Amino acid sequence: MCLVYELQRAAAQQGVSIESLVRKASLVSRKLELDDFCKVLDKELNGYSDGDSIPDYRKIRGILKCNSPMVGWIPVMIEDKSFEKSFTMRVIRQSIHELQCLYDINESYLTMMLSAQENRYLAQYIEEDIEMSQFCIMIPRASIYNILARIQDFILRWSLDLEELGILGDDIKFSLEEIDKAKTASKIYNYTNNFSGSVATSQIQQGATDSHMEA
């Protein structure tokens, strides 16, 4: 079976390993000499660094909570929605493998602990005891699934567009004509533009509701 059909079959499967799928897409991309798209797929496999352009689907919204000594984590109500969004909107930089591991923990929410600076700033804003205050962002597990699902969908549509242009490959090779067509067809090389967005901070590292995470 040709490479593109193999990629399509994998991308259409429910429950496919997204990490394995991206590796297959990376192989096809490299064989077609689509260097920019290869770089994007490599970032998905290895994680995004500071300064990288981040795809919009990796921006997620969480729930701001404070740790009460009496009852545990409780929601923090902030009237200024713009201010609240500045804390609850996060960019996830971690690799697909890490995200899949977090999703597989099977908790309803993942906990992202805020930095000491963010804790002090929030405590001052809501007039809480700075020394006693500990804040976190609760990230819905479904948000992690959405990142993985969007990547799978991108790859499926990309493989279908390759087929539409007659770019299929023979075994694990592509002809010079197919390579040239892929490199000149805007429908194909413009897929790199789907992986763009603004840059922010934070990473999820662990998966239970009370677990500590580094920002």
Residue ranges and their predicted role:
Residues 3-11:
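N-terminal, leucine/charged-rich tether regions that mediate assembly and partner docking
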Residues 10-13, 28, 47, 102-105, ...:
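Surface-exposed polar/charged interaction patches
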Residues 134-137, 141-182:
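Extended, non-transmembrane interaction/recognition domains
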Residues 90-140, 144:
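Short acidic, glycine/tyrosine-flanked loop/strand segments centered on an H-E-D-like triad
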Residues 168, 172-215:
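Long, low-complexity intrinsically disordered regions enriched in small/polar
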Residues 51-100:
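Heme-based O2/NO sensor domains and their adjacent alpha-helical segments
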Residues 14-71:
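N-terminal interaction modules that seed assembly of large macromolecular complexes
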